[in-house]
A protein has these predicted regions:
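Surface-exposed alpha-helical segments enriched in charged/polar residues
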Residues: 53-57, 134, 160
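Short low-complexity, flexible loop/linker segments enriched in glycine and/or proline
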Residues: 83, 154-163
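A short, structure-level motif marking secondary-structure boundaries and short turns
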Residues: 36-40, 116-119, 161-162
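N-terminal topogenic membrane-targeting module
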Residues: 25-83
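Active-site metal-binding core of divalent-cation-utilizing nuclease and nuclease-like domains
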Residues: 68-110
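Charged, low-complexity surface patches
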Residues: 44, 48, 102, 124-126
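Basic, amphipathic alpha-helical patches used to engage nucleic acids or provide basic targeting signals
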Residues: 97, 104-158
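N-terminal signal-anchor transmembrane alpha helix of single-pass membrane proteins
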Residues: 1-34
């Protein structure tokens, strides 16, 4: 079967039209795609917010500042002599501590507080906690693991014992 020039022109026209339609579909999808697929979320979970209401007066009684959800990489650094600097940094860059107590004047980190719950009983979380505990120990910063609920007085005593 031999195609005439007219048949070839029609075939090329159909292919061109198909490519045009596919290009338009791609363009419309791209323009519709939200470049900012983000939404606001609460800074603290309900459990964390409840604990914060107990922690805040305990910290105020000791004249301490409370910071929340601080990345480990913001409160500790990889030793400059570490050969595998990036590997060590990558281990701390995406982990955070629930609450940090600091000196309000110097902002020196005095203590970390992890609010534990049932998720800390999972194998991956236990492994993560062991690593974080070791990193805090290496930096000489006390790290408390606490469970909610707790009274302000109980927490105040626990903080004073470990500072």
């Amino acid at each position: 079967m031999k195609l005439s020039n007219g048949d070839i022109s029609i075939l090329i026209g159909c292919l061109g039209a198909l490519l045009l339609v596919l290009g338009l579909i791609w363009l419309i999808r791209r323009l519709r795609k939200d470049p900012y697929p983000y939404e606001r979320r609460p800074l603290l979970t309900d459990n964390e917010a409840q604990f914060y209401e107990v922690l805040r007066p305990a910290a105020e009684a000791l004249d301490l500042q409370v910071l929340i959800k601080m990345r480990l990489a913001d409160i500790m650094a990889v030793k400059s002599t570490e050969k595998d600097y990036m590997a060590a940094f990558n281990r701390i860059k995406a982990k955070h501590t629930d609450f940090i107590l600091t000196d309000p004047e110097t902002m020196e980190v005095l203590m970390g507080i992890e609010l534990d719950d049932k998720s800390h009983e999972q194998d991956a979380r236990i492994e993560r906690d062991i690593f974080v505990d070791g990193a805090y120990r290496a930096c000489g910063i006390p790290l408390l693991h606490v469970w909610n609920p707790m009274t302000t007085e109980e927490l105040l005593d626990l903080i004073e014992e470990n500072l």
